[in-house]
């Protein structure tokens, strides 16, 4: 049996892999998307399904106003003492000299249960992780952020003991590893294996130069000796490898005594207009999760098949377990809660944003702020998980002025998105409008207004993603579809396009309603269809 990479498709970065008995879990970053943290489950490392979003309450994660690519960075999931432990960072400032961020701990006895209220740990840097040593002691590690002009901002990896009894950090933090010449040392995970403590970190930045570095020491506080063939994982030297950006990793030992590495990766597309500065391409699906097998030599881990990472990997000697899909091809909103694959921006889906019961078998969204807001958006979306898919919805919406709009959106962040929306024109009544936001530059390229007939109840909207391009379609009866012949570029919904690669999420598609007049007019969505080709 083979593991086929990536195992978690679409925006699922910074994997923290964990074993509890014979069950395996991967927690990934969600940044500004709510609920916070995605946890996937597997029995065999081959087949995975989404099972939990542990940060469900504003008391656990308050992101209103957080910047693009702020929010939850690099969670660390572990299992010890009969319960799950989750460390996460909430990043409040991403630009400038300072990186204002706060590290928290929540726990739960079951992976999909009601997670505890958070314990605030520190704010000295991001990518925090919790290490449970064999002697019962626990330690927090994180990268240290240094804002000083004459210093490198990545100041090394710090460690500090955590007292579970007192529910706080004790003692003094200590820098135990300053990194290698690759710089940008982050994402620490510590393991006590045999005679050594192994410190796994990410280096080189989370673009194409990304890498996983490992060092070891006989003492937890160091000094740490770097792997003789470091980095143990990177695709920087192999631009033709289908898995790029390989780095930010974590290690698991299976119950069959085999070793694996879960890591971040990206699968670029190469549009015809690629410049020399983007010869590595663009990754609209965001940073995904892959798994490699490890072997040991001279008490050092190595990646089977080469440090660049492989698409196919030998699976562990565990019987296969296949799960049902976590989303239907067509979601007709029959449940009282949103499907687990849907998320909202920064804030939870509450009665303020919408309802699944006020209009039975509909998702009702109340108009709020625009797609450029970082506060209150009525936007329910899911990840692009393929570069070949269709997404479709039907919306009943009766706007009364031009400030009210509802429809289908493809979104990266507040500065990069496209939307096909029902809105209002003073002379024509209900119309369809295509709006493009390209690095915060706006356009509405339809030369001829698309007027919606008065008798039409539902307006049907569809998007077809065709790898490096995508197109919108509309219908007034679900049978006769009209293509809007404007090719939109998938690359513009990628980390690599946004300000030259300074952001960290991926493309989403979903349903949105805005009302900047402040009247909160509702839009009713009859279904949402997502079908990969």
Swiss-Prot record:
Keywords: Carbohydrate metabolism, Cell membrane, Glycosidase, Hydrolase, Membrane, Polysaccharide degradation, Xylan degradation. It comes from the Bacteria. Transmembrane segments: none annotated. Its main location: membrane. One of its GO terms (molecular function) is xylan 1,4-beta-xylosidase activity. The keyword S-adenosyl-L-methionine does not apply. It is found in: Cell membrane. It catalyses: Hydrolysis of (1->4)-beta-D-xylans, to remove successive D-xylose residues from the non-reducing termini. CDD domains: GH43_SXA-like. Gene3D superfamilies: 2.60.120.200, Glycosyl hydrolase domain, family 43. GO terms for cellular component: plasma membrane. Pfam families: GH43_C2 (PF17851), Glyco_hydro_43 (PF04616). Induction: Up-regulated by xylose. Subject to carbon catabolite repression (CCR). Belongs to the glycosyl hydrolase 43 family. PANTHER family: BETA-XYLOSIDASE, BETA-XYLOSIDASE-RELATED. This is Beta-xylosidase. The gene is xynB.
């Amino acid at each position: 049996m083979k593991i086929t990479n990536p195992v978690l498709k679409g925006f699922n970065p910074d994997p923290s892999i964990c074993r509890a008995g014979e069950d395996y879990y991967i927690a990934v970053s969600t940044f500004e998307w709510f609920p916070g943290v995605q946890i996937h489950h597997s029995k065999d490392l081959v087949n995975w399904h989404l099972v939990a979003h542990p940060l469900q309450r504003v008391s656990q994660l308050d992101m209103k106003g957080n910047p693009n690519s702020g929010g939850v960075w690099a969670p660390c999931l572990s299992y010890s003492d009969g319960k799950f432990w989750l460390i996460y960072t909430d990043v409040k400032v991403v630009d400038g000299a300072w990186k204002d961020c706060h590290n928290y701990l929540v726990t739960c006895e079951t992976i999909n249960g009601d997670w505890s209220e958070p314990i605030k740990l520190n704010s000295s840097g991001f990518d925090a992780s919790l290490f449970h040593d064999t002697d019962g002691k626990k330690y927090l590690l994180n990268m240290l952020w240094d804002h000083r002009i004459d210093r490198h901002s990545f100041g090394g990896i710090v460690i500090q003991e955590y007292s579970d009894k007192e529910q706080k950090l004790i003692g003094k933090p200590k820098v135990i590893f300053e990194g290698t010449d690759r710089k940008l040392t982050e994402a620490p995970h510590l393991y006590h294996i045999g005679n050594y403590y192994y410190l796994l970190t990410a280096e080189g930045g989370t673009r194409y130069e990304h890498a996983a570095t490992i060092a070891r020491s006989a003492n937890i506080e160091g000094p740490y000796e770097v792997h003789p063939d470091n980095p143990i994982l990177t695709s920087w030297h192999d631009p033709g490898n289908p898995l790029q950006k390989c780095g930010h990793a974590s290690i698991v030992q299976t119950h069959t005594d085999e070793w694996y590495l879960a890591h971040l990766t990206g699968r670029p597309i190469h549009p015809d207009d690629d410049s020399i500065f983007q010869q590595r391409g663009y990754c609209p699906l965001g940073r995904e999760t892959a798994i490699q097998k490890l072997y040991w030599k001279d008490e050092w881990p190595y990646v089977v098949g080469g440090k660049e990472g492989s698409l196919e990997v030998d699976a562990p000697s565990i019987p296969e377990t296949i799960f049902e899909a976590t989303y239907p091809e067509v979601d007709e909103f029959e449940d009282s809660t949103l499907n687990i694959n849907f998320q909202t921006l920064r804030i939870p889906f509450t009665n303020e944003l919408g309802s699944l019961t006020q209009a039975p078998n509909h998702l009702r969204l109340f108009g709020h702020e625009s797609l450029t807001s970082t506060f209150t958006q009525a936007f329910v979306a899911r990840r692009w998980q393929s570069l070949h898919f269709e997404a479709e919805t039907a919306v009943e919406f009766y706007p009364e002025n031009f400030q009210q709009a509802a429809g289908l959106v493809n979104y990266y962040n507040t500065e990069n998105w496209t939307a096909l929306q029902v809105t209002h024109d003073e002379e024509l009544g209900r119309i369809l409008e295509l709006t493009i936001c390209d690095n915060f530059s706006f356009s509405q390229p339809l030369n001829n207004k698309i007027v919606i007939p008065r008798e039409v109840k539902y307006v049907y909207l569809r998007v077809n993603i065709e790898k490096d391009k995508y197109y919108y379609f509309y219908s007034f009866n679900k049978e006769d579809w009209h293509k809007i012949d404007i090719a939109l570029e998938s690359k513009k919904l990628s980390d690599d396009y946004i300000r030259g690669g300074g952001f960290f999420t991926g493309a989403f598609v979903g349903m949105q309603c805005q009302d900047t007049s402040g009247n909160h007019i509702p839009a009713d969505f009859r279904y949402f269809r997502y079908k990969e080709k």
